[in-house]
Amino acid sequence: MIRKAFVMQVNPDSHDEYERRHTPIWPELESVLKDHGAHHYAIYLDKARNLLFATVEIESEERWNAVAHTDVCQRWWKHMRDVMPSNPDNSPVSAELKEVFYLD
């Protein structure tokens, strides 16, 4: 498994709405993530900094990157763009983090 971590932001007035939309995520999005090899996906909210911290374990970079090209992911991004900073293609503005320590 490949461990990934990344950060995103949520609009200051959208914390509750962001959480509501993830409780739960759409079943078809969950299926696509699992079908593309995503495991142990978690998102944490730092309300003081409007920061989202996400971790996920993936089976391959290619399968993970393919999620972005699915219809359900495109619809999800469009659904979320009003609660978080987004790129022109509606994907969330995010930054991948480098792992510097891991204890198994």
UniProtKB/Swiss-Prot annotation:
Classification via InterPro entries: Dimeric_a/b-barrel, L-rhamnose_mutarotase, Rham/fucose_mutarotase
GO biological process: rhamnose catabolic process
Entry annotated with the keyword Metal-binding: no
Catalytically driven reaction(s): alpha-L-rhamnose = beta-L-rhamnose
EC number, UniProt record: 5.1.3.32
GO molecular function: L-rhamnose mutarotase activity
Binding site for substrate: Y18, Y41, W76, W77
Listed GO CC annotations: cytoplasm
Active site: H22 (proton donor)
Matches recorded under SUPFAM superfamilies: Dimeric alpha+beta barrel
Subcellular location: Cytoplasm
UniProtKB keywords: Carbohydrate metabolism, Cytoplasm, Isomerase, Rhamnose metabolism
Pathway where this protein functions: Carbohydrate metabolism; L-rhamnose metabolism
Enzyme class: isomerase
Domain of life: Bacteria
Subunit note: Homodimer.
Its job: Involved in the anomeric conversion of L-rhamnose.
Name of the molecule in the record: L-rhamnose mutarotase
Gene that produces this protein: rhaM
